[in-house]
């Protein structure tokens, strides 16, 4: 049975709209929480930020490669696959929930979508393309739409060293970045 959607909010929008930042800020406003992120390096980056705000003894990092779990941790920053299922927390967030559609990892994101709930608040972040499914599964949930704050554009092939500040490099293979 799908968990009730009375405390579930979806934040949908394109990349670079502040969805993850919003979830982090919401989590640290509670006494405890769990956030599931799609990438190990992103989990590490968020962990480092939460440690500054809440302290090393209160913050755990759980990924497939790293486990830093202080005995009294209250905030758990994880890859989605590594999110603990035995912890009752006030807040839960899952980032990039549209990965429910992913062939390899979709079952994990779908499980979190259907069953992961915070006692007070549950946030699911993702792109707009998941909205039709959300509306069918969670007809009473709140959906917040975010718009991109800055322009994203393709500037063609450039030397890595000649990129303007705040540029993003998108590649499907590491070797493509070096080429």
Locations of regions flagged by a protein language model:
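Conserved lysine of the Walker
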Residues: 19-20
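Conserved strand-helix element at the start of the C-terminal RecA-like helicase core
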Residues: 31-46, 122-125, 163-179
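Walker B catalytic acidic pair
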Residues: 80, 95-97
């Amino acid at each position: 049975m799908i968990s009730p959607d009375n405390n579930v909010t979806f934040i949908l929008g394109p990349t670079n709209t502040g969805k993850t930042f919003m979830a982090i800020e919401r989590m640290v406003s509670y006494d405890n929480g769990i956030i599931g992120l799609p990438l190990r390096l992103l989990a590490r980056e968020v962990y480092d930020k939460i440690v500054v705000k809440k302290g090393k003894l209160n913050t755990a990092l759980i990924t497939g490669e790293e486990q830093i779990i202080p005995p009294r941790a209250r905030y758990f920053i994880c890859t989605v696959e590594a999110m603990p299922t035995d912890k009752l927390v006030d807040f839960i967030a899952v980032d990039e929930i549209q990965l429910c559609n992913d062939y390899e990892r979709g079952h994990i994101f779908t499980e979190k979508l259907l069953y992961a709930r915070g006692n007070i608040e549950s946030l699911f972040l993702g792109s707009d393309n998941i909205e039709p499914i959300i509306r069918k599964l969670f007809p009473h949930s709140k959906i917040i739409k975010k718009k991109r704050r800055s322009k994203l554009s393709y500037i063609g092939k450039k030397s890595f060293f000649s990129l303007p500040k705040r540029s993003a490099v998108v590649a499907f293979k590491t070797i493509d970045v070096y080429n």
